[in-house]
């Protein structure tokens, strides 16, 4: 017999959540109940899919190419035109007349509940954290973020870039201009260029989602939202799960 007692009563739910784009997006754009099962109750074990493994290999290859000039594997050589432009950025602190240009790959960032910068691994204080694929600090007050995507671009949502810009600005409060793109590798194209400079907007959106999560934790009620992704969901006891 499968018996699911449902969400924990608020008085018993003491899980400390560290937020990320991934879990915020799960709650906001996929299903609040899936969010609960995955990130609070943790009833669904993480299973790495073939697509995930492929994405990791691609990210690692591009990181080594950009950060260490290691040639791309022949399987990924078609994406050299997306990596080559980053070769022109440097960090030359010897010539003070040249605006500082710093290039980072797989940059780990974190912020506290007050929106202040903290270490990605500061488990006592980190409230939101994430990893940015490529970051260029170009000059004294400008930055550019790029996010590699190995899937399809059926629907391009800037929220992931906004979350990245929020954390980047916390670490570099002097920044006045932040722009960002997704690179859709499967389609060999660059996505829309977004102006991410208004990080207050991102902060408002993130805190709004968190408030709704905390409300649901207090009531113990997380919406079971039917949608096209139900057929891929690992919460098998949900009545909307097409795998049942």
List where the protein language model places each region.
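Nuclease catalytic cores
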Residues: 14-71, 106-107
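Catalytic cores of nuclease domains that cleave nucleic-acid phosphodiester backbones
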Residues: 61-145, 173-181
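Short beta-strand-loop-alpha-helix junction that forms the active-site gateway
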Residues: 148-154
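Short amphipathic alpha-helical face segments that pack within enzyme cores
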Residues: 57, 159-167
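Nuclease-adjacent, charged terminal/linker segments that flank catalytic cores
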Residues: 1-11
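Short coil/turn segments at secondary-structure boundaries
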Residues: 38-41, 49-52, 73-78, 98-108, ...
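Short acidic (Asp/Glu) and glycine-rich catalytic loops that position anionic groups and cofactors
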Residues: 35-41, 142-146, 182-191, 236
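Metal-dependent nuclease catalytic regions and adjoining charged, substrate-binding loops involved
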Residues: 112-118, 124, 156, 169-244
């Amino acid at each position: 017999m499968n018996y699911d007692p449902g969400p924990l009563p608020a008085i018993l739910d003491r899980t400390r959540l560290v937020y990320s784009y991934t879990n915020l997006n799960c709650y906001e754009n996929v299903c609040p109940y899936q969010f609960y099962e995955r990130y609070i109750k943790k009833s669904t074990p993480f299973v790495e899919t073939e697509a995930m493994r492929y994405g990791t290999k691609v990210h690692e290859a591009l990181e080594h190419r950009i950060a260490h000039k290691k040639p791309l594997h022949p399987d990924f050589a078609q994406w050299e035109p997306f990596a080559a432009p980053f070769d022109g950025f440097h960090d030359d602190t010897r010539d003070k007349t040249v605006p500082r240009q710093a290039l980072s790959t797989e940059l780990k960032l974190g912020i506290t509940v007050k929106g202040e910068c903290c270490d990605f691994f500061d488990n006592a204080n980190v409230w939101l954290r994430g990893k940015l694929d490529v970051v260029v600090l170009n000059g004294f007050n400008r930055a550019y973020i790029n996010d590699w995507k190995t899937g399809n671009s059926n629907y391009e949502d800037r929220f992931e870039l906004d979350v990245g810009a929020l954390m980047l600005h916390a670490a570099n409060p002097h920044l006045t201009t932040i722009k960002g793109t997704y690179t859709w590798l499967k389609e060999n194209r660059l996505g829309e260029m977004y102006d991410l400079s208004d990080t207050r907007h991102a902060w408002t959106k993130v805190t709004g989602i968190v408030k709704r999560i905390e409300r649901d934790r207090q009531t113990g009620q997380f919406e079971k939202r039917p949608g096209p992704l139900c057929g891929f969901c690992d919460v098998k006891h949900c009545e909307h799960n097409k795998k049942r």
